[in-house]
A protein has these predicted regions:
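Catalytic phosphate/metal-binding cores of nucleic-acid and nucleotide-processing enzymes, i.e., regions
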Residues: 1-127
């Protein structure tokens, strides 16, 4: 098992600052949609050989053309998608006992069309 990568374009309203400014009903709908998207994308990427690991590494890379999210905003924006990956069985849970390595990074791209966020889940095999 190498890992599973899903690619999303998170709504800026899901960032920490965006959620703070948004109406609670709008936020609830955005979160539910992002979670469902994570579930569907996870199912698309999962194959029959995938076994839900007890412990995993999660790597998040934001590809941005103009201004990147702050790391706390990026973590907040992808949280519902990660919940969807838990729902579909890619991750056992999203607590520290199951996600033992969590990496965030940015990568500059040339055009707005290239803006995206990738979430890669890799199993951590036991000793």
């Amino acid at each position: 098992m190498n890992g599973i990568t899903v690619e999303i374009r998170p709504d800026g309203r899901l960032s920490k600052n965006g959620l703070r400014r948004a109406n609670w009903q709008e936020s609830r709908q955005l979160i539910a949609q992002a979670r469902e998207d994570g579930f569907v994308l996870g199912r698309i990427e999962m194959d029959d050989s995938w076994e839900t690991p007890d412990q995993a590494s999660v790597s998040i890379v934001q590809y941005y053309a103009r201004q990147p999210f702050d790391f706390d905003g990026l973590a907040c924006a992808v949280a519902p998608t990660i919940d969807g990956l838990v729902d579909c069985g890619i991750l056992a849970d999203d607590d520290p006992a199951h996600i033992v390595r969590y990496e965030l990074s940015h990568c500059k791209v040339k055009t707005m069309a290239e803006n995206r966020v990738t979430i890669t889940v890799r199993p951590i095999l036991g000793p």
